[in-house]
Amino acid sequence: MVTGDGNQLMEPTRYRIETKTRASAILVLAGVALVLIFAALPAFAGRGLIQDLIFVFYMLALAQCWNLLAGYAGLVSVGQQAFVGLGGYLLFALTIGAGIDPIAAVVLSGLIAAILAVPTAFVVFRLRGPYFAIGSWVVAEVYRLVFAQFKQLGGGTGTSLPSSATNEIFGIEWVKAMFEVRSPAARDIITYWIALVLAAGALSLVYLVLRSRYGLALSAIRDSEATAESAGVDSFRTKLGVYVLVAATTGMIGALIYLQKARISPDAAFSVLDWTAYVIFIVVIGGVGTIEGPIVGVIVFYALQRYLADFGTWYLILLGALAIGIMLFAPKGIWGYVAQRYSVALFPVRRMLVRPRE
């Protein structure tokens, strides 16, 4: 570039923003390989291990959903059990009342949960901070009381899935022939595969959201909603989108949980301890606001539950003491501490400013 007086000016350097890295490409390949290994596991593993992994997968998916809502959008909810229970009851209603195949009912439960999340959002989004948390819990209690009134679904005592429904799940005959197992074990294998898909899907969903402009908007709202709106972010629509997305995913997870259990009751389906307190524990000890945190947290939680659950009340006391200790000495969680100390990220979501090659 030459100016009017003959002086030559340097061309401005143009930078570009990259989200894809070599590490992320390797991660995708490793993730696909790991999912394929897990998918083939029923051919070699016993039924006990399969049932344990179902639990790990759906708790991981629930933790990722709560982490997306609270850790990235700043919507700290203690009412996640609302959509777990809703999904479970919708599964029973669709299967028993409408005669729909349970696998199709799992998907439909998520879609209906997403639809019902819209009017719910218009209520709870009027609240801020701790009031939002309390409001989300109240919504869950309202759902619990409502479903306790449906006599067709067992009322307050609950009901069970009929054997005709659980023994005729789509693909069960193929699984029985392939693995030479009976109907209960075949149902566990099908449930295991769906749980694996939901866990991998939840991880992928969170990762893709955080690497998008939508993820930037969520983080901006979490840090300062007023500042985000002044920059042009529609905070209500952004929060509504993530709330509905989490509701849909959580609804499908809830439907899957009670497909495996084959029995449901209002107190169990809308349990704040099982579906929110434990999930918050997983995210807190692993690391809030990181994708890796819930993975670490669910491994720790599974190990503690497997080896210490027989101690009764002492087990819950230990969980509480561990959570308090982590919050005091490693506020960013186990993974947050490791990532800060060693500068490592399994799921890189940062954007890099790259100068083009000459």
Locations of regions flagged by a protein language model:
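Transmembrane alpha-helices and adjacent helix-loop boundaries
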Residues: 2-358
